Every structure is written in C-alpha cells, then in structure tokens.
Design a protein with these regions (language model features):
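Glycine-rich beta-strand-centered segment in the early N-terminal region that forms part
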Residues: 22-39, 49-91
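NAD(P)H dinucleotide-binding glycine-rich loop of Rossmann-like/cofactor-binding domains
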Residues: 37, 46, 77, 86-149
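Short glycine-centered segments of the SAM/dcSAM-binding site in methyltransferase folds
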Residues: 83, 142, 166, 231-232, ...
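Short, glycine/polar-rich helix-capping loops at beta-to-alpha or helix-loop-helix junctions
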Residues: 93-96, 171-179, 243-248
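Adenosine-nucleotide cofactor-binding segment
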Residues: 145, 161-219, 270
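Hydrophobic/small residue at the entry helix of a nucleotide-binding pocket
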Residues: 152
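Glycine-rich phosphate-binding loop and adjacent beta-alpha segment
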Residues: 171, 218-289, 323
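C-terminal hydrophobic helical "lid"/dimerization subdomain
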Residues: 271-323
Length: 323
C-alpha cells in the first residue's frame, strides 16, 4: 500500500502523520500520478493549523510533480509514463500517489526537472498572476516585494527584473539580503527597519506603484505607507497572521489607494488559463530568465521537520519534499 501524510487534528507540525492509504483507480476523466517531488507552501501550514479549515482527515499539499501511472477511459492528452506537474485548488499532494482531473495537469518540458517543477508550480504561477495579471509590471516602475528571499518572492523578483522594473526587496536577515542581491534586487531593506521610511527615501519621497505582501498582519499598514498615490496593495499571504479588518477611509487618506486580496485559482480557473500561465513560466525558466532556487529538501515522511523550518523563517527559496 502507498503512504501519505495525514492530519487528524489541527495543530502544530506534530499532527503530520505518516500512514498507509489505499491505492485508488482513476475515474473516466482522471489521471493517477506517482509523485516524485512535492512543493511545500505556507498554505500547507494554514491548513495544518486550521486557519483554512478543511474536513478532517486531510492529506495536505497543493503542488507536485511526477509520472502518469494510470489513465481514465476518456483521457486522451496523456499517456502512462508522461512527466506531469500540477497546482491544485484542493489538498492531497503529500502522498505517494494522487488522482487528478486530467485538465488540471500540465506536461513537463524536458528541460525542467521534477524537483524544479514541484518548487515552482504554486509559487511560479502565483508570481505570474501577481506580475502579469493582477498588476502588469512595466519597464521602469518601482515595486516592493516582501519576503523577497522566499519561494514566491525570489521568483517574482527575477520576473520583475526581466520585465525591466526596479525592485525594492524586503527580507528578514543579512543572509537573505545577500541572496536577493545575487538576484539583482535594486534596493534591499531588512524587515526590522522602518520599511516605509526607507522606501520613501529610496524613491525620492514618492513611494512605489505596487506592494506585493505575503507576510500579512505584521507588515500590512507599513506596506500601505510605502505606496504612492493611487498605488496598489496586493496582500496575498498570512505568514504573520491574517490582516485585520480595515476601514475604506484608511485607503482614502493614504492617497486613494487600491487594495486586493487575490487567490491564485481565480486566475487559472480554466484549463486554458492554466496552460497559458504555465507556458509563460516554463519558457522563462528554460531560457534562464528565472532560476528556481530549491533551498532545502526533506523526505516526505519528515514533513513535520520541513514545516518547523518554514514557520521559523529558516528557509530560503523553495522547499521540496521528495519520494
């Protein structure tokens, strides 16, 4: 029997249990994927703690890469042995095998390794949505990226530089500052500093056109103060906790600001949207415009250790669970 990580009670990393599970047969429109690499994301932590409450027991995880192991009767676009990857709107990736709808899988190009794919499906497609759909970053504009040394942040930094933007990167340590400088950040601010004051100084008092903030509660209001008039605040994560309710007048008095709290799956809702976004991501990776930094790997059965490292801000780039 195959194995999976399951959660029977919400809580700390210790609730992640390595268990035997049934090997299921695919339905007519499904593909069974034998996982080789699984991406770790903060959304996995939210699901483990119960911030995003699913029905227990839960197999966590949203992104993975692997090999097609079995096909449903109506699936024509894949064959057994094909290399595939996915990002899913539902949990289930922390497992040796998984059933997936065929229209939510993408073929992996030959030049993209399994661990690379697992490290970038959710994070890379999030970066694509942030920089190419939610706010189309333009050459010459100045943007701010929080947690710029993290999985999404490091991809977004490289993508923004490819588009010709100037990037102010906010990070949590000198080691992470060195990493984002290696990836061509124009300015670096440490998170314990007065970020808004630093940003205003770096931009001649004007501020930035857009802030991408995955940290949440601890950085939200300072992020608003980094924006120029009519700037856009994109809050897309809760690493420090959910953002508290905000009165619309707070946006008005800070310069008629715009605020959005996007979810990736609204931007890849159809198979066509998914395939288009994935192709754009893969093309940039294959041409070397974006490098995927896998900072650390753990065997799947040690997922609890990986969660502890992620929550304590000890990781850089992406973390991959291996089988």
């Amino acid at each position: 029997m195959p194995n999976a990580i399951r959660i029977h009670n919400f809580g700390g990393p210790e609730v992640l249990q390595w268990e035997s599970v049934d090997l299921l047969e695919p339905g007519p429109d499904q593909v069974r994927v034998r996982h080789t690499a699984i991406g770790l994301n903060f959304i996995d932590v939210y699901e483990r703690t119960g911030l995003y409450q699913g029905q227990l027991p839960i197999v966590p995880g949203r992104e993975a890469a692997g090999v097609v192991d079995a096909l449903g009767s109506r699936v024509k676009q894949f064959a057994v042995g094909d290399r595939v990857a996915y990002v899913a709107s539902s949990t289930g990736a922390y497992s040796e095998y998984r059933l997936m709808p065929a229209d939510r899988l993408v073929h992996l190009p030959d030049g993209v390794a399994d661990q690379t794919a697992a490290a970038m499906m959710l994070k890379g497609l999030t970066a694509q949505a942030l920089l190419r759909q939610i706010h189309r970053v333009r050459k010459g504009e100045t943007i701010l990226i929080h947690a710029a040394a993290g999985g999404v942040g490091l991809i977004a930094l490289q993508w923004a530089k490819h588009l010709g933007a100037k990037v102010i990167a906010v990070v949590g340590s000198e080691a992470k500052a060195a990493l984002v400088r290696e990836h061509r950040a124009d300015h670096v601010v440490l998170g314990h500093e007065d970020v808004a004051a630093q940003v205003k100084s770096m931009t001649g008092g004007r501020g930035v056109s857009v802030v991408y903030d995955s940290v949440g509660k601890d950085t939200f209001f300072a992020s608003l103060d980094c924006l120029q008039p009519r700037g856009l605040m994109v809050t897309y994560g809760n690493a420090s906790g959910p953002v508290p309710p905000i009165a619309p007048l707070e946006l008005s008095k800070r310069g008629s600001l715009f605020l959005t709290r996007p979810t990736l799956f609204h931007y890849i809702a159809t198979s066509r949207e998914l395939q288009r976004a994935a192709k754009e991501l893969f093309d940039l990776v294959l041409k070397g415009a974006i490098g995927i930094h896998v900072g650390q790997t753990y065997p799947l059965q040690y997922a609890a250790q990986a969660h502890r490292a992620l929550e304590s801000r000890q990781t850089t780039g992406s973390t991959v669970l291996t089988i």
